[in-house]
Amino acid sequence: MHLNNLNNFNNLENNGEYHCSGPIIKKPFRHIALTVPSSDITNFNEIFYVEPQYIAQAIRLTNTFQGAIDPLTLNFNFEKALQIANGLPNAGVTGTINQSVIHQTIEVSVMISQIKEIIRSVLGLVINSANFWNSVVSAITNTFTNLEPQVDENWIVWRNLSATQTSYFYKILFSIQNEDTGRFMAILPIAFEITVDVQKQQLLFITIKDSARYEVKMKALTVVQALDSYNAPIIDVFNVRNYSLHRPNHNILQNLNVNPIKS
């Protein structure tokens, strides 16, 4: 696991070296499950915790990281994701992980709690919102349980199946922007490579109280990007071919000093 600090980002805010479209105002968030027609396929279970005027930026970044998905295997290419992240304007990588995190017989609920704390570390930000962390727990829970309704979703790929074992990929992408992130948005794409000593049909109905032998590898990185100073129409970003993935922020962070992270 590799973590950078956010001092550079905090210094920029404190020094007033740039301006965004308006002040960050603490306000309640409303949870909406949104399904829209789109000409672009994504292979992430997308979870956004952002103000409405920044939805376009969150979707644009999601589209960007779709480029890290291997079109043949649908696996998440960690090195490609780093390359994409290091090329984003007004942004920096603040945390990464690319390693095995579970290799034991474990109760699913315990595993969910452990992975939540790993995500907290990789995120590298102090997020106080209980609603956000509830969304994180829900997403992790759905990575390992409630699989039957998700069996054909784009973010899950079934791999090696046998009478005693099941392997699958599962990909999530979090976007977070609120008073805790200040004038930045954090994007956290996560890919799980999961092997369970359970036959697939059984696994589809596994619960948080069940135990099994799991091998779980996590590949993830956190990218923090300055908030856009423009409000793009949401309709544009549902067709990546008509929308620039690297549209410049007109208030560029001249002194953003975050070193690229190498794989």
Swiss-Prot record:
UniProt protein name: Type-2Ba cytolytic delta-endotoxin
General function of this protein: Kills the larvae of dipteran insects by making pores in the epithelial cell membrane of the insect midgut.
Coiled-coil zones: none
Species this chain originates from: Bacillus thuringiensis subsp. israelensis
One GO CC term, this protein: extracellular region
One GO term (biological process): sporulation resulting in formation of a cellular spore
Protein origin, superkingdom: Bacteria
Single GO molecular function: toxin activity
Keywords on record: Plasmid, Sporulation, Toxin, Virulence
Signal peptide as annotated in the record: none
Family to which this protein belongs: Belongs to the cyt1/cyt2 endotoxin family.
Metal-binding among keywords: no
Pfam families given in the database record: Bac_thur_toxin
InterPro entries: CytB_endotoxin-like_sf, Endotoxin_CytB
The record's account of how the chain is modified after translation: Active after proteolytic processing.
